[in-house]
Amino acid sequence: LEPEFSVTWRLIAKTGATCRSTLEMLIDDRTKHTDTFDVVFIALGVNDAVRLRSKRTFLRRHQAVRAILRAQFSATSIVVPGVPPLGGFPALTGLMRWVLGAHAKRLDQALSSALSKETQTAYLSFDLPLTADAMAEDGYHPNAQSYVVLGERGGSGISTLVRQI
């Protein structure tokens, strides 16, 4: 994004985070910080899919996360990558791969549809290759190079939204 934009950033990440745990953390965090954000990049969904959260619950909680970011942290724009296609993860096999893959796809389609109705929100499809050479050793997480690609795509989505403001 630099040098076109002045960038300061804050990373909030937690292994196993779900929409619910993120919402709880944001509610708690808002009393501790007075930060405001022009753009927020929210990567949630994998852990909700693995826990087989219903579409309705997932969408409601994801929307609540976006709402608190806008209301309490003044987020003008929100960029959301899609729910990764768990059915392609090398670490998952057999029935687990099929069930989680189908569920993640349903959540992703519902999220894409919901976000298409919001202004100043961008959905980025998750279309990275899920080959062994693009994944970390655990076969579940992207490797460093894949995160670079995700970051570049996120930056492009942010740049597009900011230009629309």
PLM region spans:
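A short helix->loop->beta-strand "cap" motif at the edges of active sites that frequently abuts
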Residues: F73-S77
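Alpha/beta-hydrolase-fold catalytic nucleophile elbow
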Residues: A43, P81-G82
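Conserved SGNH/GDSL esterase-like catalytic core that processes O-acyl groups on lipids
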Residues: L1-A64
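Short "lid" loop at the C-terminus of a central beta-strand within the Rossmann-like core
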Residues: V46-N47, P84-G87
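Histidine-centered active-site loop/cap adjacent to the catalytic His
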Residues: E137-I165
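Substrate-gating cap/lid alpha-helix
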Residues: G88-S125
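Alpha-helix N-cap and loop-to-helix initiation/capping positions
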Residues: R53-R61, L95-H103, D138, P142-S146
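Generic structural signal for well-ordered alpha-helices
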Residues: H62-A67, D108
